[in-house]
Amino acid sequence: MKILLIGYGAMNQRVARLAEEKGHEIVGVIENTPKATTPYQQYQHIADVKDADVAIDFSNPNLLFPLLDEEFHLPLVVATTGEKEKLLNKLDELSQNIPVFFSANMSYGVHALTKILAAAVPLLDDFDIELTEAHHNKKVDAPSGTLEKLYDVIVSLKENVTPVYDRHELNEKRQPQDIGIHSIRGGTIVGEHEVLFAGTDETIQITHRAQSKDIFANGAIQAAERLVNKPNGFYTFDNL
């Protein structure tokens, strides 16, 4: 499989290493600013790359969105999470002409976590729910896109849910519809996501811990391996 990388930060550098270990070929990289240290052919536009089978994006909205407005016909795996609503609308539009895969978290374990959560929420309807995520001290956005995904699962199953981000400003007891959302930043934490169900005299915790960023890179590669054989459409872990 011949892969075009959109962005060449820490994550796509991992994609390149792991993809080549699997026998795939990196045919080029698209970056905001060409760099002499990038060990692959650099391009400005997706359509300029003639021999790629798929593009894998681990970049940011500033790089990705202008590319999506261009005309190209390359299967696309997207891991950028910024400006999610705008991004999903654009990817849905593109999926009429190319196969597109999107996930806010490329770990299949996190996908499994969302399924476990969907099963637990109706069973624990009278339990309070708190969501916590922890990441390294260089992560700039909070809460994480994955935590937002977990929150969306809860919203789809419970009515009148209220997100609570900063409880120290509230001078009132917890309300039944509250969903606490907490972010921790420190050290080199790869990524941890926890759902706490707190009931009377008992608690249940569901946790996913990433032990290496390789899980996200491998997830993107595995998605690409499947996507290249798919017809045009919008794909997630649910239908890939």
UniProtKB/Swiss-Prot annotation:
Domain of life: Bacteria
Catalysed reactions listed for this entry: (S)-2,3,4,5-tetrahydrodipicolinate + NAD(+) + H2O = (2S,4S)-4-hydroxy-2,3,4,5-tetrahydrodipicolinate + NADH + H(+); (S)-2,3,4,5-tetrahydrodipicolinate + NADP(+) + H2O = (2S,4S)-4-hydroxy-2,3,4,5-tetrahydrodipicolinate + NADPH + H(+)
InterPro entries for this protein: DapB_C, DapB_N, DapB_N_CS, DHDPR_bac, NAD(P)-bd_dom_sf
E.C. code: 1.17.1.8
Pathway note: Amino-acid biosynthesis; L-lysine biosynthesis via DAP pathway; (S)-tetrahydrodipicolinate from L-aspartate: step 4/4
Signal sequence segment: none
Location in or out of the cell: Cytoplasm
Pfam families assigned to the protein according to its UniProt record, in alphabetical order: DapB_C, DapB_N
BP-aspect Gene Ontology terms: diaminopimelate biosynthetic process; lysine biosynthetic process via diaminopimelate
Residues of the active site: H135 (proton donor/acceptor), K139 (proton donor)
Classification via HAMAP family: DapB (MF_00102)
Protein name: 4-hydroxy-tetrahydrodipicolinate reductase
Organism: Staphylococcus aureus (strain JH9)
Gene (UniProt): dapB
